[in-house]
Amino acid sequence: MSKQDEQANRLKTRLGFKWHNPTLLIQALTHSSCVHENRGHGLCHNQRLEFLGDAVLELIISEHLYKMFPDRTEGELTKMRASSVCEPSLAKVARGLDLGRCLRMGRGEERSGGRERPSILADAFEALLGAIYLDQGLEISRHFVLNCLSSIIDDVVAGRLDRDYKTELQEILQQSSPDPLTYTIMDESGPDHDKTFTAGVIYKGKVIGKGSGHSKKEAEQQAAKDAFQHLEGMGKSGHKSAGPIR
């Protein structure tokens, strides 16, 4: 038995329920790099489960915040949800579950520090949630999420977490114009197991901020931060006349 299988068994025990389809857990803990390095072995990576888990997570947290804070506005709830389920928050939870040591991944990804990469850990948490939802249903999924994220939500409410610049930037610019913000990946560099993405945030046809990161989400957040800080420098972060800044 591999070290990853041993860790997965410990995780299974820690979760505290009997899996109806244990292959879902295996899939949730299989990174795409493992599949790419072992073609022909019938392995399935966790990206589809991540897609599902992302939606389940948003539903559970949205409902929880809606019930927990009946006096908060839609904008406030959106901001709280974004901070609760952002990449750093989910990576922190994944570390608490020791998901990094459970993951099956390719040698190249592992050598480059993939087991500790926030984007991989956050994606693994969402994939695990997707697997739990398919195997156990919504109620157990809700219990799992709220148990894992309760301290994160407390930190969000108390203002102890990093700011969500994407949400803040959108709120500022929409005060003066309904024009949407869009994000685009402008560049990718590095090998498949250690990519760096450069994102741009576009407003009224102009790139108003750029940022880089080891995941698309991180790059977009950095691009939003760049634009937001530029707005602050122009004295517009609390002003209703914000517009294109570059």
Swiss-Prot record:
Annotated GO CC locations: cytoplasm
GO molecular function, one term: ribonuclease III activity
InterPro entries, per database record: dsRBD_dom (IPR014720), RNase_III (IPR011907), RNase_III_dom (IPR000999), RNase_III_sf (IPR036389)
Cofactors required: Mg(2+)
Binding site for Mg(2+): 50, 123, 126
Cellular location(s): Cytoplasm
Catalytic activity as recorded in UniProt: Endonucleolytic cleavage to 5'-phosphomonoester
Enzyme class at the top of the EC tree: hydrolase
Residues in RNase III domain copies: 8-137
UniProt domain DRBM: residue ranges: 164-233
Active-site residues annotated for this sequence: 54, 126
Main subcellular location: cytoplasm
Annotated spans, Disordered: 212-246
Entry keyword set: Cytoplasm, Endonuclease, Hydrolase, Magnesium, Metal-binding, mRNA processing, Nuclease, RNA-binding, rRNA processing, rRNA-binding, tRNA processing
Gene Ontology BP term (one): tRNA processing
PANTHER family hit by this protein: RIBONUCLEASE 3, RIBONUCLEASE III
Family statement drawn from the similarity comment of this UniProt entry: Belongs to the ribonuclease III family.
Task of the protein: Digests double-stranded RNA. Involved in the processing of primary rRNA transcript to yield the immediate precursors to the large and small rRNAs (23S and 16S). Processes some mRNAs, and tRNAs when they are encoded in the rRNA operon. Processes pre-crRNA and tracrRNA of type II CRISPR loci if present in the organism.
Quaternary context: Homodimer.
HAMAP family assigned to the protein according to its UniProt record, in alphabetical order: RNase_III (MF_00104)
Protein's name in the database: Ribonuclease 3
Organism: Desulforamulus reducens (strain ATCC BAA-1160 / DSM 100696 / MI-1)
Source taxonomy: Bacteria, Bacillati, Bacillota, Clostridia, Eubacteriales
Gene that produces this protein: rnc
